[in-house]
């Protein structure tokens, strides 16, 4: 989890280097020795290229599924709302949650909420998806529906970094497995 949070600079690493898609993230130290990003615009660019799916979903409870998915494309990427809605509906179909597009997160199961979180990340058209234990907060019977979506993304050739305890899944869909 800390590794993923360092990749998108939600946590600032104290040493080492981060390179995403060949771009080295420039860091510097202040007069107290604290590390911080040298260029905030570079950090913004990085974050639009990395889709993060959190363990606890982090959906906005006051928004519908559809509103959750279009929020970032409309406000960050400046995608026209009509285009964002069309894209979001296609993604919701893909992750198998379209029929719940007008529901609020509190009316969804954990597996459904996690699929919405995946859809929200996909809506930003990221170069890479970061999954922070995407099934650990789910009831065992709901794990399969989330793994199915992730397996489909892997089969499409999506670059994903997944922190998981689902070792069988990791071995099955990964090109490389790293134990930390």
Question: Model features per residue range: what roles?
Answer:
Residues 16-31:
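Conserved ABC transporter NBD signature motif
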Residues 103, 124, 156:
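Conserved signature/switch motifs of ABC ATPase nucleotide-binding domains
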Residues 104-108, 112:
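Conserved ABC ATPase signature
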Residues 129-132:
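Catalytic Walker B motif of ABC-type/P-loop ATPase nucleotide-binding domains
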Residues 140-142:
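Helix N-cap at the start of a conserved alpha-helix in ABC-type nucleotide-binding domains
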């Amino acid at each position: 989890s800390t590794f993923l949070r360092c990749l998108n600079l939600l946590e600032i690493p104290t040493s080492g280097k981060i390179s995403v898609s060949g771009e080295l993230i420039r860091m510097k130290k202040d007069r107290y020795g604290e590390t911080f990003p040298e260029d905030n615009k570079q950090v913004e660019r990085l974050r639009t290229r990395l889709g993060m799916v959190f363990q606890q979903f982090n959906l906005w409870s006051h928004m519908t599924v559809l509103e959750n998915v279009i929020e970032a494309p409309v406000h960050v990427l400046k995608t026209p709302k009509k285009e964002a809605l069309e894209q979001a509906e296609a993604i919701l179909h893909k992750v198998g949650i379209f029929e719940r597009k007008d529901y609020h997160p509190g009316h969804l199961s954990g597996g459904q909420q996690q699929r919405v979180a995946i859809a929200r990340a996909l809506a930003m058209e990221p170069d890479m998806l970061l999954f922070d234990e995407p099934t650990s907060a789910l009831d065992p019977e709901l794990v399969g529906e989330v793994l199915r979506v992730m397996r489909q993304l892997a089969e499409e050739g999506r670059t994903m970094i997944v922190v998981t305890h689902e070792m069988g899944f990791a071995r099955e869909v990964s090109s490389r497995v790293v134990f930390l």
